[in-house]
């Protein structure tokens, strides 16, 4: 078995989820090397948020940052061949005018931030999702770019890590707990792990 490294340019704590694996992928893609990713469980993780996430991506939000990052993620997964752009509906029941107003505000925010979201009628919502009872809703928000990561974001996380490791620029260490951070002069200079200490120029 390979020896756990004593130093690295970058240490990623929490490699097994979609965020940690994406960080490794993007660092490698940007030319970084000597990257060590660790996770306290398997890679991809079987206990983290990614392992039980819905895998549904919805780009429409009141936050410009959320709209941008989710839109980026959708395009990223799509280019990998791991996205199903099935669209997403949010409905407002008859009599719930506050909900209807909130959906309209959300659509306004989404349009301002570049998404393809729009308001649709109850009949249009019914046509998209026949199980809806048309007379019970007054309208809906429709985002045609919403969809599902396939087969799972957990699977994609594993693919991203595997591809990064194959370049020789990164290492993946599963079942490796981060026990503590070594901080000197306000800067993290290393990580104590269950496999030993690793010095690092950068810790994520």
Question: What label would you give each PLM region?
Answer:
Residues 28-49:
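Glycine-rich FAD pyrophosphate-binding loop
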Residues 41-43, 125, 160:
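Short beta-to-alpha linker loops that shape the active-site pocket of alpha/beta-hydrolase fold enzymes
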Residues 24, 28-29, 163:
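Gly/Ala-rich phosphate-binding loop of Rossmann-like dinucleotide-binding domains
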Residues 2-5, 29, 197:
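Short, flexible hinge/linker loops that cap or flank conserved catalytic cores
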Residues 2-19, 36:
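Beta1/beta-strand and adjacent pyrophosphate-binding region of the FAD-binding site
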